[in-house]
Amino acid sequence: MDDGNDDAITPGGDDAGNNPFAGMPLFGDLSRALSGQGPLNWDAARQFALLAASGGDMAGAMTPGGKVLVPTGNIEPNVRIKYAELAGIARLHVADVMQLTVIESDPEVATPEQWAAQTLDAYRPLFNDMATSLGQTSDDDGSNDPMMQMMAGLSKMMAPAMMGMSVGSMVGGLARRAFGVYDLPIPREGGFASKLVVVPPTIDNFAAASDIELDEMRLWVIAHEMAGHTLLSIPHIADHLRSLVQRHVGAFRPDSSAMT
């Protein structure tokens, strides 16, 4: 009699040898839930990114529907206006030094949480490539030991969630230190490629801690962001950098000998 469960969790299914919960419908459902988003669990990545970016305040960070909410207060309108004013000065300087066309739009402002969410989306293909390469297994990793087979299956099941936690924590940690998009000199694609984004709370805190006049700090950050955007908007430079990063993340391999 067909109980409605697919072959992945029944004895004799194609993955039965690698699934530690084969033949156990309840745990099979858990297995699919943990790995249901592919090589990286993006729900976990977003939640851990917001947790790290907000310094541990996850209250209200995620709704039951998964919509990202921002715990930190919005940036004041006068701060947005100030960055727009300074952008004109920075634009003239960067254009004069680089002798290239500089982006005309004013910089957007973001909280660390918003920066983290945007960065996860912008680099999603790279993180997926990295998770895929780390999730690969070689033929010589097999073992006739049932316990080793079960542990290997358990590790494979948990890998997407663990990768999501690791990636999210890393991006969230960076969000608390980043001044803008081009702190990471990695080209972004799609709609993210045309944006300048600065993080006023982090900039303000650094200026205060380093005893730097706030407008001077803001001007430096805007000039840095415009220079990075101008350079990485050159197609052959952006394509080459992107290919180098993709090659690097695609070359990762898991080391089973490290688990001894």
List each language-model region with its residue ranges.
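Auxiliary, metal-adjacent structural segments of Zn-dependent hydrolase domains
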Residues: 83-201
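Short, structured coil/loop segments at alpha-helix boundaries
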Residues: 72, 76-80, 144-145, 179, ...
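Active-site recognition of the HExxH zinc-binding catalytic motif
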Residues: 217-233
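N-terminal low-structure segments adjacent to metalloprotease catalytic domains
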Residues: 1-129
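Post-HExxH zinc-binding segment in Zn-dependent metallohydrolases
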Residues: 164, 168-182, 231-260
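Short pre-active-site segment immediately N-terminal to the catalytic Zn-binding motif
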Residues: 203-221
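A Zn2+-metalloprotease active-site environment signal
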Residues: 47-58, 69, 142, 148-155, ...
